[in-house]
C-alpha cells in the first residue's frame, strides 16, 4: 500500500476518534456540533470551541561520529530499535525537550541540535518533530528502565537497509545509515 494511502486511512481514524470523544462539552455538558468554518467542535450552549488534540513530541537521532544510539522501548511488545523520543512538556521548547528526553532516557548530554523534519503520527495524536544531535561528552549509556529496555550504539554497517519507511524515526535512521544527515 502506498504510504500516502496508509496515512490517509490513519488520519481518518484519528479524526473519527476525536469526534467520538468530543460529543459533549467538557465545560457545561451540552451537545457539541461540528463547526461549519473549520475543523472544530462547538458547544451548542456555551460556545466553547474544541480543536483536534495534537501532542508535540520529539524524536532524536543521537550521533557519535560514525555511530548512532538506538533504543528499544520497555513498554509494549517492541522488538525493534528506534530513536529516543518523548513528549514536549508545558512551557518547554523543542530544543529543551530534546536535551531533557535524552538525559532522562539514556543519561547523555547532547549538542548541535539540528531540526530534520516533522511528521503527523495519528496513532497517538502526535506531531513528531525530528532532530539530529551530536554526543557532548562521555558515551556511556544509563537507561531509564521504566522507559527503555535496551540502548546501544550502532555503526552504519550494523544498521539494516530494509527499515520500514512509515515512521520518521526509521527514516532518520536510514538517513544516518546513508550518511545524508549532515
Short names for language-model regions:
Residues 37, 54-55, 82, 125-126, ...:
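Short glycine/proline-enriched turns and hinge-like loops at secondary-structure junctions
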Residues 119-142:
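Active-site-adjacent beta-strand/loop module that shapes the phosphate/pyrophosphate-binding cleft
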Residues 40-83, 87, 109-110, 133-137:
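N-terminal strand-loop-strand
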Residues 82-117, 131:
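The catalytic Nudix box helix
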Residues 72-73, 85, 114-119, 135, ...:
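Active-site proximal loops enriched in glycine and acidic residues that flank catalytic Cys/His/Asp
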Residues 11-61:
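Cys/His-rich short segments
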Amino acid at each position: 500500500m502506498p504510504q500516502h494511502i496508509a496515512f490517509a486511512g490513519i488520519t481518518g481514524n484519528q479524526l473519527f476518534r476525536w469526534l467520538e470523544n468530543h460529543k459533549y462539552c467538557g465545560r457545561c455538558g451540552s451537545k457539541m456540533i461540528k463547526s461549519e468554518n473549520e475543523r472544530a467542535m462547538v458547544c451548542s450552549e456555551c460556545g466553547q470551541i474544541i480543536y483536534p488534540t495534537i501532542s508535540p513530541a520529539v524524536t532524536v537521532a543521537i550521533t557519535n561520529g560514525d555511530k548512532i544510539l538506538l533504543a528499544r522501548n520497555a513498554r509494549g511488545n517492541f522488538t525493534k530499535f528506534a530513536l529516543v523520543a518523548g513528549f514536549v512538556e508545558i512551557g518547554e521548547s523543542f530544543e529543551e525537550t530534546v536535551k531533557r528526553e535524552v538525559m532522562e532516557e539514556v543519561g547523555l548530554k547532547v549538542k548541535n541540535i539540528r531540526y530534520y523534519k516533522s511528521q503527523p503520527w495519528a496513532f497517538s495524536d502526535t506531531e513528531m518533530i525530528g532532530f539530529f544531535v551530536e554526543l557532548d561528552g562521555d558515551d556511556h549509556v544509563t537507561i531509564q528502565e521504566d522507559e527503555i529496555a535496551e540502548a546501544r550504539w550502532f555503526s552504519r554497517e550494523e544498521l539494516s537497509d530494509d527499515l520500514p519507511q512509515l515512521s520518521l524515526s526509521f527514516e532518520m535512521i536510514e538517513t544516518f545509515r546513508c550518511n545524508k544527515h549532515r
